[in-house]
Amino acid sequence: MEEIDQAGVYAPYLALWRQGDCLLPERALLAWAQSQRLLPLLLWRGKKAGWALPDALTRAAQNVRYREQAQQMLAENQLRALGVLAQKLDIPLVLVKGACVARVYPETWLRPYNDIDLLIAEEHLPYFLPAVLDLGYTWLGALTGQRGWHLPPLAPKTTGLKLEVHTALARERGRSLFTFGQWTTGIHPFIPFPGLWVPDPVDHALYMIHHAIVHHELVLGFLPFIDLAYWTQSWGEAEWQALADQARTFDLYRVASLSFALTAWLSDIVWPRTVQQLFPVPPDDILLAARRIVIGAGTQKLPHLQRDMPERNLRGLLKYLGLILLGDPVTRQALPRSEKIRFYLRRPFQLLSNHGPTLWRLVRGERRTRAAWQVQRRLQAWLRDEHL
């Protein structure tokens, strides 16, 4: 398999990431590292290993580092204020995703993130949303119509990161996954920010895996798997066994196996025997297809039929189309009437803007788009143990 990789189109990018070798023009390497959100981490790795990175890459990485440090200072102020609000309302708010994961990196600025994600119990939304709006947050109108099943983002009053409020962190085939109710027994206080909570590490790892491979179908690139390497670096046999058990319970065992195979490949590591036994490496064709998507970091927005259709029949297709066009009615109830109207007016046009060109190429039979669609279909079918 490695011979195929080294002869492949993505060998120069792997060489940059693993050894700091520059086998392509600086502009191409810089564009790739930016798209993968790896510049701060690449700079840090280069300094540790003594790599001679090109000046353009170094300058760009330093700029991203300073910007990320400033942005995370603003984020920490927001987190403190949200923690105080949670204590005042006596509502548990669970911090997830980037702001949570950054804490396991050697330095938090190595892990860029652009928003703050909170998980909340659905019954607490009527109390939390008015209170957070009173803090000065406003619905981010430009993005209000882009969400199929969860709340639009909220923007802070002045400067800072967007706030994403979730009642579930995923939805697949009509099921809400990774909800507050499913996690409630494992959450624990987030010591740096009183009033906020964080998930059980195993629960959050399974969510991270699902988010990268199932929800985003690998198009987020390298970063989710670098996250996973840092997140699990201190785990023992008990945590690995618990993750394997949970992955089987949620029908995510193949997804987890693929995630750890990709993590080992990207980080150039060998997992302990326990991990290798619990999560066997997928077949070569599946692994190669996944690697190509990860390196490319998703150049096309393909429809998520495999993820979002509740049933593989006409009724399932109609439910899928209704969800895409109208949004999730349960989640929408939390929105003010004006925002509901805005969502339904914007939704068709923004769907057309986001997905129209790719869907048109797919319908016309454009070779590259068709090939990407077929690769994604095969990959998702294998992950779900389905026959095409």
Description of each model-found segment:
Residues 1-114, 120-388:
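Conserved NTP-donor binding/palm subdomain of two-metal-ion nucleotidyltransferases/polymerases, i.e.
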